[in-house]
Regions:
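Single conserved hydrophobic/aromatic residue that forms the stacking wall/gate
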Residues: 1-5, 9
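Aromatic- and histidine-enriched alpha-helix N-cap/loop-to-helix transition segments
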Residues: 6-7, 20, 40-51, 102-112, ...
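Structural helix-adjacent loops and short alpha-helical linkers that scaffold large soluble proteins
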Residues: 12-26, 57-70, 118-131, 191-204, ...
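Long, well-ordered core segments of solenoidal/helical folds
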Residues: 20-40, 69-89, 129-149, 155-166, ...
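Carbohydrate-binding/catalytic loop surfaces
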Residues: 47-62, 88-105, 146-175, 218-241, ...
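CBM-like carbohydrate-recognition segments
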Residues: 64-67, 231-329
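Aromatic- and glycine-enriched pocket-lining scaffold segments that form the walls
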Residues: 86-151
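Oxyanion-binding "anion nests"
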Residues: 179-215
């Protein structure tokens, strides 16, 4: 949570320019430096370090932050299996679940750090790792209708897909809301970094199937096939991730399509800004009603800090768009 807290503080500083907020952010950020100095233990290195140190470097240009990012990117890349073509997400699940090489959709979020490192003094190989991971995931981790599996399990000898399953979703055959959100955000970033039109096309396909199935207020149920709909819990974190992604994606597309995505993002934010999803003074968080891990009975209908992070990011992106600025600062 130190990473997400650091990230939220930095986003608040970005809006307020209050130096006290930046100092609080630095305290949380510095507590994560050790992650750049130890062997990679799972895929979350990218999210933990790039959101904290990446935003920190963007705002301060502190060279110490840059070194941490570059070292962590090298560490993350050690999880890459060239036979499979993706990074291993959860080494801890290899033996207990008999998942020889597992890649989760969340891992798409970590590619941004690899792209950044490759063009900011890191090993150019990191770019190739990110592209390979995106390509293999695109080929193997989606159904014909462009809904995603949470987990792809691969054979380490042949590199072939063994099966697609869920871990945090309702069932292997269903669309877990935040997993699809990671895909939308991830492929938007891959297009930004490569300018390869196949990723732009794919980002739209995974977005459209998500948008088509949303309830009226544009905040998804935690899984699109969750039991108990319409009374099933919503996932505000997924809505925040998608809103932020669509504000960027909209800028890469012609007016009609781009406006449709931008308008959808604005509707999502309008719902998240409403009393139905705002915590007010009841909690230290901004947003209520996220779901972390339903099958594990963890963080159900809860406030989750990364929901706040992407919510604030989306609000800042919308502000920049309204001011006629580049959505990516």
């Amino acid at each position: 949570e130190s990473s997400a807290a650091s990230d939220v503080y930095k986003r608040q500083y970005e809006y307020t320019q209050d130096k006290h907020i930046l100092e609080e952010a630095k305290k949380f950020t510095n507590s994560l430096e050790f992650l750049s100095q130890i062997p990679a233990y799972d895929h979350d290195l990218g999210f933990l370090v790039f959101c904290s140190y990446g935003n920190g470097y963007r705002l301060t240009k502190d060279p110490a932050y840059k070194k941490v990012i570059l070292d962590t990117a090298d560490s993350l890349a050690t999880l890459f299996n060239p036979v499979v073509g993706t990074m291993l997400s959860w080494p801890r699940e290899v033996e207990p679940r008999n998942w020889p090489h597992n890649t989760i959709m969340d891992n798409m979020i970590n590619l941004e750090m690899l792209f950044w490192a490759a063009k900011n003094g890191g090993n150019p190989y990191l770019y190739d790792v990110a592209v390979s991971h995106a390509d293999k995931t695109m080929k193997c981790q989606f159904r014909p209708d462009y809904t995603s599996y949470h987990v792809a399990v691969y054979d380490t000898i042949t590199g072939n897909l063994i099966k697609g399953v869920t871990h945090q979703g309702y069932a292997d055959s269903t669309m877990w809301a935040r997993g699809q959100a990671w895909a939308i955000y991830g492929y938007t970033v891959v297009y930004r970094e490569t300018k390869d039109p196949k990723y732009l096309d794919f980002a739209q396909k995974v977005t459209d199937v998500y948008l088509e199935r949303l309830p009226e207020d544009k905040v998804p149920y935690w899984d699109f096939s969750a039991p108990g709909i319409p009374d099933a819990p919503r996932d505000a974190s997924a809505a925040a991730v998608v809103a932020s992604a669509l504000l960027e994606l909209s800028t890469y597309l012609p007016n009609g399509t781009g406006k449709r995505y931008k308008d959808a993002a604005i509707e999502m934010l309008a719902s998240l800004n409403s009393d139905s999803y705002q915590s007010g003074k009841s909690k230290p968080s901004f947003l209520l009603h996220s779901v972390g891990h339903w099958p594990a009975h963890s963080e159900i209908d809860a406030s989750i800090i990364y929901a706040d992070y992407y919510y604030i990011e989306a609000l800042l992106r919308l502000k920049r768009l309204q001011e006629g600025k580049n959505v990516i600062k």
